[in-house]
């Protein structure tokens, strides 16, 4: 028997489904018992503090009901991304109605008892969040911090050609910078290889206490706006369900058929021409179906519908009748049986199995997640038989490795960035792939642009790159986001939100593991002499170090071989944010590939060829974390050894900075005994660090040895010479060597002439660069001589 999905009878069932979702959503706000109002409502049935939001709910439930309809009609693989921040009930209510919630949480049964538990737990101690948190079936996007819904949807459908991301965008959310720029995503979705995004702008007109911009914009101007970005908006407007149901059904059919037509043409004709994708603009009142007014003020269709629209709680039942009237307006007896189960005629129109948006495998670890097939990183090793003699650019070396990662993983590995792949010297990847770019290509002026490619860096937006990568890894694939170190601060709150997702998801047995999020910080603070002070900020190291240690790794490889070893680790890891600070400029190469592997595996190591303590207790410990810190420390050690060959020096190179933390703070941390093995209990430690110094001081605070002299970035910068950036922050060889003398009281007299010579070199440096515009030959031409 053929089903007429647009018939009044079918749409009447859709309406019942919608009312059921609305009923559940209101119940979750207010009730902790008596979920179907089968007896008179009393104070103990109501929460002491109803917490949550109402304004966006009915509109989203309406959209969700109609998405279910097109899933059934067209046999779609579709999932839901809830952009509007405060609408946690939407995905909970709908996943409860379709049974997914009970599949995952069997105690939340499809009856009165289960409904009572569902209501009580919402925004309740020990319960669930008021957003689409990881606890919510079908969610890959919490929506607490606004602006990333489309980016996440796009990241998810890349290389998933059969999937459609139904992304509901709040009209308030659409005013954020990240969301505004994400409308440009049309230029990067390949209709042959990728799936599709169906944005639905939920235009209810109001934010917390202000109107929205789109809410006061005419349809004509909205149409022009979206058409300029290759979207074809389909408008649906109204507040009468009898009229809006057929209107949205027609709009959804039109949108899905256009998506299918675009993909069919592209795939049958191998034609990846930039299409015009459909989207829906859905105008319905904020707080739709809720109280019309309260105490003389308008509620429905007003900002006042945003949160809890009527004042009823366990301690104030004066207006309980209004709450009951609201709930009963959905006619729950038409929707639920006496035992609390859903009526059969409503069940008939709900998708089943993996067709349910809440059960789509893409939302729980991906459709077909696979580990990466990695090349042997040792095959790309740089010769370091004479330490420091070989000069290479670490990112160029690594790009050859990444080129072959792409070759071995042609459909589940991507590079993302804000137009910085070339600037960050990842040249090698373009030997095997291109940038994915759907706009016109001008061969005489463009480079590596093509409709299909494994690099997505042609939009200058850190938010887009980060959001795309998050959507990609949350759906089981792998990748990295490479950007300038200072401008990764643009997305540090996104990194925080991703960390929070990882943490909460990891606490759920049913959530599958995610590949790690890999962030590559290049063009770093001590290499930004040419762009200056604005481009100098290593603070993401400190920002991420403040998060739960189980989910954060920070690597500071000093050379190409160490970067290769780090890459092998991060691409095999899961459930982490891997933050890698690396060099793109020509730098001396220090560690053999096996030394590098050991440094990465252990997190740090004593470098015998740069130490003179011969296993005995040293006079001074030098430590370095980062490219320039390692270079300057080795140069300082050479200076000291040449002048004081009897000084017993130990050099510790640190790659995994957070490994130094106490096990009381980080389960991977070194024990006190291990820490003392490297740094002693009381000998002076001169620590050259790539970032802000307090991170190192915090690490040493819990240790025996407080005899610490940290030289990091001291917030001094300018457009100057490369070495001068280090001098400005006293993270140069001369200041490090001076610090080592000052740290040893016994050398106050014997080291005085040496300290003066260091001051003389600093004065010479300052004079020379202001005359020549380049660094001293003694710096530019410096070579490691060795200590033995």
Curated annotation (Swiss-Prot):
What's the superkingdom here?
Answer: Bacteria
What InterPro entries does its record include?
Answer: Phosphoketolase (IPR023962), THDP-binding (IPR029061), Transketo_C/PFOR_II (IPR009014), Xul5P/Fru6P_PKetolase (IPR005593), Xul5P/Fru6P_PKetolase_C (IPR018969), Xul5P/Fru6P_PKetolase_CS (IPR019790), Xul5P/Fru6P_PKetolase_N (IPR018970), Xul5P/Fru6P_PKetolase_ThDP_BS (IPR019789)
Keywords (alphabetical) are: Lyase, Thiamine pyrophosphate
So which cofactors does this thing need? thiamine diphosphate
- Please give the Gene3D superfamilies that the UniProt record associates with this protein: 3.40.50.920, 3.40.50.970
Task: List the molecular function annotations (GO) for this entry.
Answer: aldehyde-lyase activity
* Entry coiled-coil feature ranges: none
Q: Which PROSITE patterns match?
A: PHOSPHOKETOLASE_1, PHOSPHOKETOLASE_2
GO biological process terms, alphabetically, are:
carbohydrate metabolic process
The protein's matches in Pfam families, at most eight in alphabetical order, are given as: XFP, XFP_C, XFP_N
Q: What is its EC number?
A: 4.1.2.-
Sequence similarity: Belongs to the XFP family.
Its protein name is: Probable phosphoketolase 1
Name the source organism. Lactiplantibacillus plantarum (strain ATCC BAA-793 / NCIMB 8826 / WCFS1) (Lactobacillus plantarum)
């Amino acid at each position: 028997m053929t089903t007429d999905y647009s018939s009044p009878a079918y749409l009447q069932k859709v309406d019942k489904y919608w009312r059921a979702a609305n009923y559940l959503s209101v119940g979750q706000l207010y009730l902790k018992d008596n979920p179907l109002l089968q007896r008179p409502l009393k104070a103990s049935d109501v929460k002491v503090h109803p917490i949550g939001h109402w304004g966006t709910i009915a509109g989203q439930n309406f959209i969700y009901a109609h998405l279910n309809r097109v899933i059934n009609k067209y046999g779609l693989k579709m999932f839901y991304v809830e952009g509007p921040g405060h609408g946690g009930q939407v995905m909970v209510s709908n996943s409860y109605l379709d049974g997914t919630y009970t599949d995952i949480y069997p105690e939340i049964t499809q009856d009165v008892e289960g409904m009572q538990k569902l209501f009580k737990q919402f925004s309740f101690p020990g319960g669930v969040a008021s957003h689409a948190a990881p606890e919510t079936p079908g969610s890959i996007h919490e929506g607490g911090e606004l602006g990333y819904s489309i980016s996440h949807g796009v990241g998810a459908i890349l290389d998933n050609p059969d999937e459609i991301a139904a992304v509901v965008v709040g009209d308030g959310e659409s005013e954020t910078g990240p969301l505004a720029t994400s409308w440009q995503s049309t230029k990067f979705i390949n209709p042959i290889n990728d799936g599709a995004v169906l944005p639905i702008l939920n235009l209810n007109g109001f934010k917390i206490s202000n109107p929205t911009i789109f809410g006061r914009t005419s349809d004509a101007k909205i149409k022009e706006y979206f058409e300029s970005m290759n979207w074809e908006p389909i408008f649906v407007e109204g507040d009468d369900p009898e009229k809006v149901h057929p209107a949205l059904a027609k709009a959804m059919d039109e949108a899905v058929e256009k998506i299918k037509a675009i993909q069919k043409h592209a795939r049958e004709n191998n034609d990846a021409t930039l299409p015009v994708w459909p989207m829906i603009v859905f105008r319905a009142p904020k707080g739709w179906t809720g109280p019309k007014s309260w105490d003389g003020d308008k509620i429905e269709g007003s900002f006042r519908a945003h949160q809890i629209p009527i004042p009823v709680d366990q301690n104030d039942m004066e207006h309980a009748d209004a709450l009951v009237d609201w709930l009963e307006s959905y006619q729950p007896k038409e929707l639920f049986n006496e035992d609390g189960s859903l009526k059969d005629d409503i069940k008939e129109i709900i998708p089943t199995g993996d067709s349910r948006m809440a059960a789509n495998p893409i939302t729980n670890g991906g459709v077909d997640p696979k580990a990466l097939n990695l090349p042997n990183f040792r095959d790309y090793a740089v010769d370091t038989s004479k330490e420091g003699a070989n000069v290479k650019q670490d990112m160029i070396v690594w790009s050859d490795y990444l080129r072959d990662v792409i070759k071995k993983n042609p459909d589940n590995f991507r590079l993302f960035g804000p137009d910085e792949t070339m600037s960050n010297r990842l040249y090698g990847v373009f030997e095997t792939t291109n940038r994915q770019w759907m706009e016109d290509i001008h061969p005489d002026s463009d480079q590596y642009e093509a409709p299909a490619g494994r690099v997505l860096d042609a939009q200058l937006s850190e938010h887009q790159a980060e959001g795309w990568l998050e959507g990609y890894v949350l759906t089981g694939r792998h990748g990295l986001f490479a950007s300038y170190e200072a401008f990764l601060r643009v997305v540090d709150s996104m990194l925080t939100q991703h960390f929070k997702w990882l943490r909460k998801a990891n606490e759920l047995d049913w959530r599958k593991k995610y590949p790690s999020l890999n962030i590559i910080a290049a063009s770093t603070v001590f290499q930004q002499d040419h762009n200056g002070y604005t481009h100098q900020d290593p603070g993401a190291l400190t920002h991420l170090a403040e998060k739960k240690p189980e989910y954060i790794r920070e690597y500071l490889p000093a050379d190409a071989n160490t970067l290769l070893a780090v890459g092998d680790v991060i691409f095999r890891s899961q459930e982490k944010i891997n933050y890698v600070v690396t060099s793109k400029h020509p730098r001396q190469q220090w560690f053999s590939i096996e030394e590098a592997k050991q440094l990465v595996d252990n997190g740090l190591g004593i470098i015998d060829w740069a130490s003179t303590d011969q296993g005995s207790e040293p006079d001074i410990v030098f430590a370095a974390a980062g490219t320039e810190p390692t270079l300057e420390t080795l140069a300082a050690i050479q200076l000291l050894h040449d002048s004081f060959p009897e000084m017993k020096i130990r050099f510790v190179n640190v790659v995994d900075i957070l490994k130094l933390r106490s096990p009381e703070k980080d389960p991977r941390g070194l024990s006190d005994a291990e820490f003392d093995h490297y740094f002693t209990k009381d000998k002076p430690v001169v620590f050259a660090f790539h970032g802000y110094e307090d991170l190192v001081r915090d690490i040493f605070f819990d240790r025996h040895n407080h005899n610490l002299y940290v030289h990091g970035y001291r917030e001094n910068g300018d457009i100057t010479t490369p070495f001068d950036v280090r001098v400005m922050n006293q993270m140069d060889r001369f200041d490090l060597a001076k610090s080592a003398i000052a740290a040893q009281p016994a050398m106050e007299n014997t080291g005085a002439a040496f300290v003066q010579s260091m001051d003389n070199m600093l004065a010479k440096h300052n004079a020379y660069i202001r005359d020549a515009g380049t660094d001293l030959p003694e710096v530019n031409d410096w070579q490691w001589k060795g200590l033995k």
